[in-house]
């Protein structure tokens, strides 16, 4: 699908790569690379680091206009469509609206990275409005996500989608290691994973006490961040109040059809995109004895979502460059990716497997991590699926 003809650097049929139950995937290099972050930055054209408020905001306006167009069509024309065509119409609306709102979510994510404009205050205002409208506590997630970028690939300090060792996985996991179990696990993860992460830190790094993105005094945040966590909570309260008023005026069924189901699709895409960016049989994780920031930042995979690459503002197919240079705006990210690929060589990871096939494969093969038996270092961990 899509991908502009890019070749995958991870797929191979070389039988010498039979490790960890992934004979069809070539492992990424895990030793220190022969290049530096400075080498990569010098390869990127300087204009790729320029952030234009006008250009960035044009994408916000475009997404909002499309979202309003879909809303107008649904509310003005769908009541006159008889069943069963009305069911088809609503399914199309939910899918289209969910995809557009996912793209809008991505722009809010860029605001949190200061990749929207040269003005931090403008970035935070736009990000707060956009993410609050999608029931995301903007500042709370901005700070936890920043720590994810600072510690990516570390088994001890990464913030989210931290794989467990075989000895620490849940006792019931092996009973879900079958097709029905994987369907159940994927459904629960896609539908509930994002709100459970925000509210209960599910799939997040362990803390010594209860961690929650809505708690200004929780262990995720520092004292200087608390005021902004309150502001993020106020944003969620404001959106919840608007939804309450809409429910009183139009009914819960109307709110769910117009807003609730598209938001659920946003949450599903968000979990799937994030999961596939950081989960792959061919990429390592590092213990404290091996981890360093540059190698950790390369523990990510660019994926192909076809036409949705543009709808999602290239968040999925330029994610390697994003973890190396998070302030590059999305409209320069593809150019930056093309610039660093020749230098990175096999350290750059791209997998063109259709995302629905990749999701099933990763759910099957990436269950826990362990170091290779007899390896010279025990600080490099690889995904396994054999209990």
Curated annotation (Swiss-Prot):
Main location: membrane
Disulfide bonds: none
Lipid bilayer topology: Multi-pass membrane protein
EC number: 1.14.18.4
Any Gene Ontology biological process: fatty acid biosynthetic process
Summary of the tissues where the protein is detected: Expressed in seeds. Barely detected in leaves.
Catalytically driven reaction(s): a 1-acyl-2-(9Z)-octadecenoyl-sn-glycero-3-phosphocholine + 2 Fe(II)-[cytochrome b5] + O2 + 2 H(+) = a 1-acyl-2-[(R)-12-hydroxyoleoyl]-sn-glycero-3-phosphocholine + 2 Fe(III)-[cytochrome b5] + H2O
GO cellular component: endoplasmic reticulum membrane
Effect in UniProt of substituting residue 319 to Q: In OLE-1; enhanced accumulation of oleic acid but low ricinoleic acid levels in seeds, high-oleic castor mutant 1
Pfam families: DUF3474, FA_desaturase
Motif (Histidine box-3): 319-323
Application of this enzyme or protein: Promotes the accumulation of hydroxy fatty acids when expressed in A.thaliana.
Regulation affecting activity: Inhibited by oleoyloxyethyl phosphocholine.
Chain segments annotated as transmembrane: 61-81, 88-108, 121-141, 183-203, 229-249, 253-273
GO molecular function, one term: oxidoreductase activity
Consequence when changing residue 319 to Q: Strongly reduced ricinoleic acid accumulation
Superkingdom of origin: Eukaryota
pH dependence: Optimum pH is 6.3.
Broad EC category: oxidoreductase
Motif Histidine box-2 mapped to chain: 145-149
Domain notes per entry: The histidine box domains may contain the active site and/or be involved in metal ion binding.
Membership in a protein family: Belongs to the fatty acid desaturase type 1 family.
Protein purpose: Oleoyl-12-hydroxylase involved in the biosynthesis of ricinoleate (12-hydroxy-cis-9-octadecenoate), the major fatty acid constituent of the oil seeds from castor bean plants. Catalyzes the hydroxylation at the 12-position of 1-acyl-2-oleoyl-sn-glycero-3-phosphocholine (2-oleoyl-PC), which seems to be the actual physiological subtrate. It uses cytochrome b5 as an electron donor. May also be involved in the production of lesquerolic acid (14-hydroxyeicos-cis-ll-enoic acid) in vitro.
PANTHER family: OMEGA-6 FATTY ACID DESATURASE, CHLOROPLASTIC
Designated name of the protein: Oleoyl-12-hydroxylase FAH12
Higher taxonomy: Eukaryota, Viridiplantae, Streptophyta, Embryophyta, Tracheophyta
Underlying gene: FAH12
